[in-house]
Regions:
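Extracellular glycan-recognition regions
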Residues: 47, 52, 60-62, 67-362
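Short glycine/acidic-rich loop motifs that flank beta-strands on beta-rich extracellular proteins
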Residues: 159, 515-518, 544, 549-558, ...
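All-beta strand scaffolds that present successive hydrophobic residues in beta-strands
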Residues: 341, 507, 534, 563-567, ...
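Acidic, glycine- and Ser/Thr-rich low-complexity intrinsically disordered tracts
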Residues: 360, 749, 759-895
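Right-handed parallel beta-helix/beta-solenoid
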Residues: 448-494, 511
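Glycine-rich repeat segments that build the extracellular carbohydrate-interaction surface of secreted
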Residues: 472-476, 493-514, 531-539
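Feature marks extracellular polysaccharide-active and adherence modules
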Residues: 475, 508, 521, 535-537, ...
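Right-handed parallel beta-helix/beta-spiral solenoid domain characteristic of secreted/periplasmic
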Residues: 487, 525-578, 630
Length: 895
């Protein structure tokens, strides 16, 4: 998709708008004829009172070029009028997409517009092409040009996770009926008020795609083009990687105010935990036009009419490729957004007599070539990594000698794919020259070029130091100049820079404060036989090291492989920043406490620029606890997550998630990046997620959220307990093939068990040993909706689902679960103690909660007064005993 920001003068605007006669269609619905919204109907139809008026022409509008003789205008006007009369001038309203429902929207016709609401987290703005929204639109024939203009007033909105929004949107598909809670995909071009990101180059004074000041507007204003979606089946998810998304900012007040890189907001009338404001826009004038040039988007000052910004989608044909004879244009609201659209004007014109299209410009891509590996190493065998945003050839030289390194001449580089090169370092400073020449035929698409095809050289320096001791001691007061002995401790940052395979870094108890993030970069790797250990010093008081990011740092990120992290706390990362992100492979994360961070406590995820095989894999998160993590909107901060970009073999064992703003666990996947690797969660507990004590706000509040976007992902939940979460206990979240074994769900606010999908045609759920039980909300059913699968995989004698009619837990044989069989139904905490703790060996202790008494464990199939051992989670003190603590000996230097 090729677009370019274009600013028009007032004269040019007049020429574009008035060089041919246009007809204005204004929606006029009298107050006493406003139609009520009927959720049983497919659409809200508002029509029958539109008027057609010809725009008065002045002498300045006359065009005497050949083919535009004024004497010919009458016949041309008649043709245009006929085309516009063929347009469907009836305004319609429809609600569709993920998170929408019959109780979460409103469409209120006004005298010359409409009020649109999407409430209670209904709908969401997404980059996958499957927005969930309330949409008010007209169908317009594809063979005529048009313009649509209106004033949008933002009456109220509540921030959650930047999926709120409003739009003036052109789409190539709209469902015929309301499609509540089901994905519906469409190519589109929109003026969008939602999450918009941009990078500003202060020297060039323009938005760039290279380095600069990055601003994340939560919310901002821009255009968004989504293409690559097949029109054959809008309810079917597109193939991963097939969807293209491009955004361009239309409002850049953050850069005018010279704000620091970060997250901001530009809209007023907002509620919730808002980001700092760089503007307070509550009303804006917007226009969308289809001309012979393309789809043109304009943003005007609503008071003066001055054009503030504009954008053009030149490859508009991508929205006109469907078999339908019409395109859809209108206004939208999503997720906690209420807007009033007034002064709607729609005009039509004939492409044959409209001004010819402008020449399509070439979009230029700035080169971004980067060595992504560390500048420090404690390993003589060192991995250097390189990435470029173009195909080309790379040569690596020793700068001191000018010699090409072994097998390092003309290495083929693929755009946005990391390339690794192994080398041996010399003690001290090692200087390398990376020379990259982009392919002159890149990129392989029309109207796009690199700004330079010249060879670029990058000087990369690696400082190699072998630490004095194999076990180094670090303290909060440690020095970069320390040697790692008890008498002369190192700083933590210095110890991490020069860590090497087999080394142990021992952290003294105390608070380690950071104003910025703490990163273990790529290339600082252990091995399978000799991992690098970062562990807490054992002490009689059981005091722990605490990494405190002061509300400004980005948390801790682990990019490397074969590390062991153990026994310390991570807290207070900045808003929207995770506590710990694991982006490497084969790491063991054990006994880490992540709490009160600005986003998810502990998350496994990689980069969408990397292929699946480069995503983090084979990581074990064991006996960790994550609690009271909260993002500003209460929509992102989970206890644990393994989502979006993860490979195979990631496991959570013996972990506890409670009082996190969003979910306990989140295994979300989206269509842009496709399915993720299988994740196993076992011997774990999720409870009371969705709210944080002492902080206003509520999130999604699911215990174990096991999928997303109707994508396959056979994630498995084993021997785990979910209770008193704000919403669902065990949630497939549209994942099509999750597996649940020997797990318990108790007294959750919504469904205890939810196995469903929103857009896939088939499911393949497997469940065995589910115990769903309630003492509250007895009328709450389960949400189990298998599609075209063997239902015996879900319904059989080893699953006890909640029967809301009989108000009991029962299996397919009619056997029920008695309260008397359960050791404890009490979730009340003792003062100063959570209802879930740990045994001395690290295993989870639930204090009898939802544990079947030994005498009621069925050992013979004939008995009906008990449950088989495989039904429900069992926490007997031996579920996840801690691994052996690494041995260490801190060096004591002589006085």
């Amino acid at each position: 998709m090729l677009k370019k920001r274009i600013k028009y003068s007032a004269l040019m605007m007049n020429l574009l708008m008035l060089s041919t006669p246009v007809l204005i269609s204004v929606v006029e619905v009298a107050a006493n004829e406003q139609q009520s919204v009927n959720e049983e109907n497919a659409h809200v139809n508002i029509g029958g009172m539109s008027t057609m008026e010809e725009v008065p022409r002045t002498s300045e509008d006359m065009d005497t070029e050949e083919g535009n003789d004024p004497m010919m205008k009458e016949s041309e006007n008649e043709k245009t009028k006929k085309q516009s009369e063929e347009a469907n001038e009836e305004w319609k309203g429809v609600v569709f997409g993920e998170s929408t429902s019959a109780s979460r929207y409103a469409i209120e016709p006004l005298e010359d517009g409409v009020r649109l609401s999407s409430t209670n987290n209904g709908g969401k703005i997404q980059s996958s092409g499957s927005d969930g929204m309330t949409y008010y639109y007209q169908a317009i024939p594809k063979d005529i040009n048009f313009r649509m203009r209106a004033t949008i007033e933002i009456e109220s909105w509540t921030y959650t996770n930047a999926q709120e929004g409003f739009a003036l949107m052109v789409r190539d598909a709209v469902p015929k009926d309301h499609l509540f809670g089901q994905a519906f995909y469409s190519n589109s071009f929109a003026i969008l008020g939602s999450r918009i990101e941009y990078v500003w180059d202060s020297d060039r004074q323009e938005v760039v795609n290279t380095s600069g000041s990055k601003y994340t507007m939560r919310l901002g204003l821009g255009t968004r083009a989504i293409t690559g979606i097949s029109s054959e089946d809008p309810q079917a998810a597109p193939a991963p990687g097939s969807v293209s998304v491009e955004t361009t900012p239309l409002e850049t007040s953050a850069r005018f105010l010279e704000k620091e890189t970060g997250s901001y907001n530009i809209f007023g009338n907002g509620h919730g935990n808002l980001f700092p404001a760089t503007n307070s826009i509550t009303k804006l004038d917007v226009e969308m036009k289809k001309t012979n040039t393309g789809l043109e988007a304009y943003y005007y000052d609503p008071e003066t009419g001055e054009e503030m910004a504009s954008d053009i989608m030149y490859d508009w044909e991508k929205l006109y490729a469907s078999d339908e004879s019409v395109i859809y244009a209108g206004f939208a609201a999503a997720r906690n957004m209420t807007i009033k659209v007034e002064g709607i004007e729609v005009a039509y014109s004939d492409p044959a007599t409209d001004p010819p299209g402008q020449e399509r410009p070439t979009r230029l891509i700035d080169p971004i070539y980067t060595v992504t590996s560390s500048n420090h190493s404690g390993n003589q065998d060192h991995t250097m990594s390189f990435r470029a945003n173009a195909d080309g050839l790379l040569t690596i030289k020793n700068k001191a000698t000018g010699e090409v390194l072994k097998n390092a001449k003309d290495l083929a580089i693929t755009t946005n794919r990391e390339f690794d090169y192994q080398t041996k370092l010399m003690e001290g400073t090692n200087e390398f020259t990376f020379s990259f020449t982009p392919d002159k035929n890149y990129p392989p698409e029309e109207y796009v070029e690199m700004t330079s095809y010249e060879t670029k050289e990058i000087l990369h320096i690696v400082d190699y130091r072998k630490p004095k001791y194999s076990t180094v001691y670090v303290t909060p007061e440690g020095s970069d100049a320390g040697n790692g002995s008890r008498q002369n401790p190192l700083s933590l940052t210095q110890a991490l820079r020069y860590a090497y395979a087999g080394q142990t870094i021992v952290m003294a108890p105390g608070t380690y404060s950071f104003e910025r993030g703490l990163t273990i970069p790529k290339g600082v790797n252990g091995t399978r036989e000799n991992p690098i250990q970062l562990i807490a010093e054992k002490n009689p008081e059981n005091k722990r090291p605490v990494l405190d990011f002061k509300g400004t740092g980005n948390g801790m990120t682990l990019f490397s492989h074969y590390w062991g992290l153990r026994g310390f706390d991570i807290t207070n990362s900045a808003a929207m920043q995770k506590g710990l992100q694991i982006s490497g492979n084969h790491n063991l994360i054990e006994e880490i406490h992540a709490y009160r961070n600005g986003n998810t406590g502990i998350q496994i995820s990689g980069s969408s620029n990397d292929p699946f095989e480069a995503w983090p894999a084979h990581n074990l998160v064991k006996n960790c606890t994550s609690f009271e993590n909260a993002d500003p909107g209460f929509e992102d901060a989970d206890g644990f997550a393994a989502k979006l970009t993860i490979g195979e073999g990631n496991v959570f064992d013996g972990c506890i998630a409670y009082h996190n703003a969003d979910d306990g666990w989140d295994l979300f996947a989206k269509n842009e990046t496709g399915s993720i690797g299988k994740v196993i969660i076992k011997n774990s507990v999720a409870y009371r997620n969705g709210w944080v004590p002492g902080i206003e706000g509520e999130g999604n509040g699911n215990g174990f959220k096991m999928g997303g976007s109707s994508l396959t992902g056979p994630h498995e939940l084993i021997n785990s307990l979910s209770f008193e979460n704000l919403a669902k206990g065990i949630d497939s979240n549209s994942g099509t093939d999750i597996i649940v074994n020997s797990s318990t769900s108790f007294n959750n606010g919504s469904y205890n068990v939810a196995l469903y999908t929103s857009s896939a045609g088939n499911t393949d759920y497997h469940a065995s040993g589910i115990l769903s039980f309630r003492t509250e909300n007895l009328e709450m059913r389960e949400q189990i909706r298998p599609l075209n699968q063997n239902e015996d995989q879900i319904y059989h004698s080893l699953n006890y689902y909640w029967n809301e009619r009989e108000k009991q837990s029962e299996n397919t044989l009619g056997h029920t679960v008695s309260k008397d069989w359960i050791e404890s139904l009490n979730t009340c905490s003792k003062e100063g103690q959570q209802p879930v703790t740990r045994y001395e060996n690290g295993s989870i202790h639930v204090h009898g909660l939802m544990q079947i008494k030994p005498g009621n464990r069925q050992t013979e199939k004939e008995r009906v007064d008990g449950l088989p051992l495989s039904v429900g989670a069992i926490f007997d003190g031996e579920t996840s005993p801690s691994s052996e603590y690494p041995e260490y000996a801190i060096v004591q230097e002589p006085n």
